A protein has these predicted regions:
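Conserved catalytic core of the tyrosine transesterase superfamily
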Residues: 1-246
C-alpha cells in the first residue's frame, strides 16, 4: 500500500516540478518549493492531497520546533503552490502561519575590512570576483552570472540580468573595477564569462563553458572571513549592501 501511495505521490511531485519550471521561478525557489513537498510527503506518509486544517496545524507546529521561520514560510508557499497548480484547488488558509515580524540590518563590510579580505584571498579569480561584487554592490549570484556582453564600458555601467524578482537592472561601473576586470580578462580571455570556471586550472579557463562554482566561492569567502577574524553573520552576502569603492 505504501509503495502505491509513494508512486502516486512521485507522479504528482513531478507535475509540481514541471509547473515550477513553467512559471519561470528562480532555481533556488524551485528547490525550496520542491523540498517542501518532499518533506510534507514523508511526514504524511505520501498523502498530502486532502490535508485538513488540523493536520496542517500539527505539521507546521512541528516544523517551527525544528526549523527556522524561513523554512516554515517556504514550506507554506511550496504547499500553496502545489495546492493551486497541481491539485487545482483554491488556497483557503491565508492565516495558517504568521511568522514574527523582524527587521534586521545586513552586515556591512567597510572599505578597510574589504581591503583585508582582498589581500587575504590568494586565488586571483576569487580576489577579482570579491572586489567586483563589493565595488558594485552585487549579490553573489548576480556576480557569477556576469558575461562580457553585460559590460558597457562606454557608459560605465553593467547590466545585471535576472536579478532579484527576475528583473534586469543597470548598475554603475566604477573606473577602478573596469580596470581590474580588463586586466583579469587579459589573463583568462574567455569569450563568454566574466568569471569562468576554475575547473581544469587557469589553462582551461579560456574554454570554460560555466562560470565559477557558487559553492567554491562561498567556501573561500567564509574561510577568508574567518582568517581575517571579521565577525560577520552572513559572509556570502555581506558585499551586496556595501558602499561602492569609487
Amino acid at each position: 500500500m505504501t509503495t502505491t501511495r509513494q508512486a502516486e505521490f512521485d507522479q504528482r511531485y513531478q507535475t509540481h516540478l514541471k509547473h515550477l519550471k513553467l512559471k519561470g521561478l528562480q532555481p533556488k525557489t524551485i528547490e525550496a518549493y520542491s523540498r517542501a513537498i518532499r518533506r510534507m510527503g514523508e511526514y504524511f506518509d505520501w498523502q498530502i492531497d486532502a490535508l485538513s486544517s488540523s493536520q496542517l496545524t500539527d505539521y507546521f507546529s512541528d516544523l517551527v520546533a525544528t526549523h527556522s521561520w524561513s523554512s516554515v514560510k517556504l514550506d507554506l508557499y511550496g504547499y500553496k503552490f502545489y495546492t493551486q497548480h497541481v491539485l487545482r484547488k483554491p488556497w483557503g488558509m491565508p492565516d495558517l502561519v504568521k511568522p514574527p515580524k523582524t527587521q534586521r540590518l545586513p552586515d556591512i563590510v567597510t572599505v578597510e575590512e574589504a581591503a583585508r579580505l582582498f589581500a587575504a584571498t590568494r586565488c586571483l579569480s576569487y580576489r577579482v570576483f570579491f572586489f567586483t561584487i563589493y565595488s558594485m554592490g552585487l549579490r553573489l549570484g548576480e556576480g557569477l552570472a556576469l558575461r562580457l556582453g553585460d559590460i558597457d564600458a562606454a557608459r560605465a555601467r553593467v547590466q545585471v540580468r535576472d536579478a532579484k524578482g527576475n528583473r534586469d537592472r543597470l548598475v554603475p561601473l566604477p573606473a577602478p573595477t573596469l580596470s581590474v576586470l580588463r586586466r583579469f580578462w587579459q589573463i583568462h580571455r574567455n569569450a563568454q564569462w566574466l568569471f569562468p570556471s576554475r575547473q581544469g586550472g587557469a589553462a582551461a579557463a579560456r574554454e570554460a563553458r560555466l562560470p565559477l562554482d557558487r559553492g567554491g566561492v562561498q567556501t573561500t569567502l567564509r574561510r577568508v572571513v574567518q582568517d581575517c577574524r571579521l565577525k560577520k553573520t552572513s559572509p556570502p552576502t555581506v558585499f551586496a549592501t556595501a558602499m561602492q569603492l569609487t
